[in-house]
Design a protein with these regions (language model features):
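Extracellular carbohydrate-recognition regions
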Residues: 19-55
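Extracellular ligand-binding interfaces
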Residues: 75-161, 179-185, 190-195
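Pro/Thr/Ser/Gly-rich low-complexity, intrinsically disordered linker/stalk tracts
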Residues: 195-226, 261, 274-292
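Short carbohydrate-recognition loop motifs
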Residues: 57-85
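Ser/Thr/Asn(+Pro)-rich, low-complexity disordered segments
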Residues: 212, 262, 274-276, 285-581
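Short beta-strand-plus-loop segments that form exposed binding edges in beta-rich domains
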Residues: 171-180
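Recognizes extended acidic, P/S/T-rich segments that occur
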Residues: 229-262, 274, 280-281
């Protein structure tokens, strides 16, 4: 029986990998910050030297292979010295599955009078290891020329690495000792396969919209797996175009910051394959920047946040992904509750039609009805294709997450109120929401009848193994509020003070543990921070999401307990945070 279960688990894992988008392992494409690249480390000794900014590589934003920047390695290799650069892999949450790679590729631009033997040596490996197998760089460059972008292609097997997935650093070090200054730029440092499929799609731009200092352009979504990037070109005269950025295939829009008001710009895009070849360009669209009022600025910000949930949703379910540029099939249930609220706002603000919202909710409810639930509660993460639980945080996280469920329920209850039209479609949505809401067994998460707390997690095979009690001040107020309000599975109202706002020794220890202070450990605080009084909150109030998550549905102006009014308390936490920053 155990063998059968193991086989089923392995098959499920294989299916998950097959369904998920495969990323390339990229060590450098662009630096999001100007001046220096955070994920690098520079060192030198003796008479050798390496240009750096606070021991990091400088960023060059004027010469690049793909827009908008590259990394500059400006060095002097002396006989009595040594220099070294470490380029670290930047892990991205949810980028867990990678395409099979056979080579390390890098684009190289040599701007100095440098011979091939004066180029550095290179190695790959783990940050934990001290010894690495270096090879000479020049042996893997064909048709070496200065002043143009060259392709460096090194078979990964040469580096003598047992498991390529363990590689998290690329190293460059001094190879010669001529004592002269040399300058080279590097870009698109990545692990790829040697052979790639050609791009067969044609890009089609659909819109351009101007704001005060930027322009948003959109295109038809790209489904062609051979496409690596969308490359964006801008022109100020409609004739002479130059590249301004690249975009990943999971996003069908780009924001171009021009920093110029009252000017017209033209745009076109092309699709890059993994060899960076560009087939035909798209059609051209144009828009002008314009002066905006404060009201228009706020509308712009709100619509942009709405688009994250509208355009960035998981395709099958219509719900929120855990993060964009992460797993493309993994839904975060709590974030989906926030997304539902954003969708309602979008319809109310006429960003979309009520008909479009209704259609999206029909998709959402069809998915949620069939998705995994445990005593009516949803897991933290769901597979958007199958509706099955995704134990993203480990094997113990394979069941219900009551807090994430409360965030989702908060959104659904708002939708239940919003869909108030006397038609069959909206009434059916309301009925479906009502069934899911009433079936959440909040009282089950007491663990036993003697408990004065709710518990965060429950696992179908390990039960209460995580054993995390819900104790405020944090983001879990809405969980207690909904549990007390439940029409079918309610808990006593006394749990608000015995659980959420508990002043027991256990609760005091919990708060002082994560807060690393006694301030606020009894739920109440009473101190003044940066001139602002704080009635409730651990330390100086904690992260701002504590005042966000529970009050997206609850109106803090109307929420007062024995200790404070939560609009005033939340405002003071925001002021403390502002003054701290």
């Amino acid at each position: 029986m155990k063998q059968v279960i193991l086989i089923l688990i392995l098959l499920a894992s294989i299916r998950a990998i097959a369904q998920e988008h495969l990323y390339d392992r990229i060590f450098f494409a662009n630096s999001p910050m100007e001046n220096s690249y955070y994920y690098s480390e520079v060192s030198y000794s003796g008479n050798s030297w390496l240009k750096n900014m606070s021991k990091r590589l400088p960023v060059n934003d004027s010469v690049y292979f793909t827009p908008g920047n590259s990394l500059e390695i400006d060095y002097v290799s002396s006989p009595n010295g040594q220099w070294q650069v470490k380029l670290f892999y930047r892990p991205v949450r949810g980028q867990d599955f990678f395409s099979k790679a056979t080579h390390m590729f890098m684009r190289l631009f040599v701007s100095s009078q440098t011979d091939t033997k004066q180029l550095p040596a290179i190695a790959i490996g783990s940050k934990k290891d001290e010894n690495h197998h270096f090879i000479t760089l020049h042996q893997h460059i064909s048709d070496y020329k200065r002043g143009k972008w060259l392709t460096v292609k090194v078979p990964l097997r040469i580096f003598q690495i047992k498991d390529i997935n363990d590689v998290d650093v690329i190293l460059f070090r001094q190879q010669s000792n001529d004592g002269k200054e040399h300058i080279m730029l590097i870009d698109q440092v990545e692990f790829l396969a040697e052979e790639h499929a050609p791009v067969r799609s044609k890009p089609i731009l659909t819109s351009a919209k101007g704001y005060e200092r930027h322009i948003d352009i959109t295109w038809q979504p790209i489904e062609d797996s051979a496409v690596k990037y969308i490359k964006i070109y801008r022109s100020s005269d409609g004739k002479n175009f130059h590249p301004v950025g690249i975009q990943s295939t999971g996003i069908a829009r780009y924001t171009d910051y021009t920093d110029t008001v009252q000017k017209k710009y033209y745009y076109k895009i092309s699709l890059l394959d993994k060899n960076y070849h560009e087939p035909a360009a798209s059609n051209v669209v144009s828009a002008s920047t314009r002066t905006m009022s404060d009201e228009e600025l706020l509308d712009m910000v709100q619509e942009a946040h709405f688009r994250y949930y509208w355009e960035g949703a998981e395709k099958n379910s219509g719900l929120a992904l855990e993060n964009v540029h992460g797993r493309r099939n993994m839904i975060a249930t709590g974030a989906s509750g926030f997304g539902i609220l954003a969708l309602i706002t979008g319809a109310e603000r006429k960003f979309i039609t009520r008909e479009s919202l209704t259609a999206r909710f029909e998709k959402i409810m069809s998915f949620l009805e069939k998705a995994d639930k445990f005593h009516g509660a949803f897991p933290h993460f769901l597979n958007g294709t199958t509706g099955k639980v995704e134990p993203f945080f480990g094997p113990r996280d394979n069941g219900a997450d009551l807090v994430e469920t409360s965030f989702l329920a908060q959104g659904m209850l708002a939708a239940k109120q919003y869909f108030n039209k006397a038609n069959k479609r909206e009434k059916y949505i309301v009925d479906r929401i009502d069934r899911i809401w009433k079936n959440i067994e909040w009282d089950w998460f007491r663990k036993d009848d003697s408990s004065k707390f709710l518990y965060w997690h429950w696992s179908p095979d390990q039960q209460w193994v995580i054993n995390h009690k819900l104790i405020g001040w944090n983001e879990t107020l809405i969980t207690y509020f909904l549990a007390i309000s439940s029409p079918e599975h309610g808990i006593p109202a006394s749990f608000y003070y015995s659980g959420w706002a508990s002043q027991s020794k256990e609760a005091e220890k919990y708060r002082s543990g994560w807060g690393q202070t006694k301030d606020g450990s009894l739920y109440t605080n009473g101190n003044i921070y940066y001139g602002v009084p704080l009635k409730v909150g651990v330390s100086n109030g904690g992260p701002l999401f504590f005042v966000h998550y529970s009050f997206l549905g609850l109106d803090p102006r109307k929420f007062t307990d024995a200790y404070c009014n939560y609009f005033s308390n939340n405002r003071n936490i925001a002021l403390i945070n502002y003054r701290y920053c």
